[in-house]
Amino acid sequence: TQSKSKYSIILGVAFVWFTTHFGGGFASGAQIYSYYVRYGVWCLITPAIAMIYNAVFFAYCLYFARKHEVYDYRSYNNALYGRFAPVFSNLFEVLYICVMCVAPAVAFATGGATLSTLTGLPYLVCTLVIGVFIFIVAIFGTDLVRRVASVLSICIIVGLLIVYIPNIIASSHEISQTASTMNSDAFPLGKALYSAFLYGTFQLANVAVFVQHARSFDKPKDAVKSMGIGCVINIIMMTVVVLGIMTVASNPD
């Protein structure tokens, strides 16, 4: 039972990463196209590079947080930066405030618009419902966040696979055509890597909401296992979305 609980925590934190990373721009393909597909056939490998970059960073941060028992981002930054903390901890505060203004706004707007489309209720009412749901989940702490993240992740993954996989199988010829066109256009690898780097770096700000989950790990090395699983999940789902976009990328309509 203890071993089962340990691995459920490891998987739960991995799902927290996925649900934090996942959003309207991810599901619709807007972000994937902007940062990956538009740079040619390299889009088949650059999502993996970005996620490995994130996984290494997050694994170290969670390992550090668990080892030094610093579970809020201010304490974590103070321990990490040492004598430079007065500068970099305060800079991170500014960054975190900016991210927290933008990211929830996107979540509320996307969730509210989707719920409004599905239910026919006014957009503002749906946005309020999304906000109340997020608030309730947040106030009950990290255990509930992990449970909700696990349930949402499974629903999201199943939903994406149901939508994308049949389309990918049915349009395999279009994917081959798109890949051939991309290959012949000879998009530079450097630009593709730089775009993946930008995407991955933007995601690093999420560490502020991750370090609190390090408290649940039995030992620091569990962070490496958790982020390894999260990396695989994110790579698979990003690749699925990339292939889904490639089915229509060569069709101007």
Model-based region annotation:
Residues 58-63, 170-176, 195-198, 230-253:
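Extracellular/periplasmic helix-exit of transmembrane alpha-helices
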Residues 111-113, 122-130, 137-168:
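Membrane-interface loop-to-helix entry segments
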Residues 2-9, 38-44, 67-99, 117-123:
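Transmembrane-helix boundary/entry motifs in multi-pass membrane transporters
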